[in-house]
């Protein structure tokens, strides 16, 4: 059995009055991510981790923010396309682990729905998808509520 590990990271600035999408789930919040797509920073980091595991570049290479095709796109579609590419190469997702850093809102009520949503898009069991949320104890741009960042790791198997 061959295995590959990929690491992903994404960050977005936050602004009032925008929808907040994380892990394919709309989170009730007065703030959301400024982005070309729907701004789902969790799925973007996950896509980068999966692509990175196979040395296929990053999300910007496959879905450039300069393309009108991806303006406002649902990030679940991007994840679905990444999974199609991975499967076409004979690989499958073993598991993923995602850490979301945001000062607010509290994300605990959304963790299970995020896991379920991303598992469904990837065609894997929810037990293979870990999502954790943390704050930065009010430190840095995340702590000041100016942005959110996500770290993701993906294990691929063949």
Predicted features by range, described:
Residues 1-3, 157-158:
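N-terminal charge/polar-biased segments
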Residues 131-135:
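Pyridoxal 5′-phosphate
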Residues 2-112, 122:
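RNase III-family endoribonuclease catalytic core
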Residues 107, 139-140:
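Acidic pyrophosphate-coordinating catalytic loop
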Residues 142-158:
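C-terminal edge-of-domain segments
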Residues 118:
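Glycine-rich, mobile lid/loop segments that gate access to catalytic sites or pores
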């Amino acid at each position: 059995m061959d295995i590959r590990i990929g690491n992903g990271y994404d960050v977005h600035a936050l602004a009032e009055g925008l929808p907040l999408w994380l892990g394919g789930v709309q989170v009730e919040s007065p703030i959301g991510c400024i982005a070309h797509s729907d701004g789902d920073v969790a799925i973007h980091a996950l896509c980068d981790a999966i692509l990175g595991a196979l040395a296929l570049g990053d999300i910007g290479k496959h879905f450039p923010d300069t393309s009108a095709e991806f303006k406002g796109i649902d990030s679940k579609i991007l994840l679905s396309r990444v999974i199609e590419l991975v499967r076409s190469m004979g690989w499958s997702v073993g598991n993923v682990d995602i850490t979301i850093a945001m000062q607010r809102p509290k994300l605990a009520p959304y963790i299970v729905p995020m896991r379920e949503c991303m598992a469904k898009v990837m065609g894997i069991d929810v037990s293979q998808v870990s999502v954790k949320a943390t704050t930065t104890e009010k430190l840095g741009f995340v702590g000041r509520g100016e942005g959110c960042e996500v770290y993701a790791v993906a294990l691929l198997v063949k």
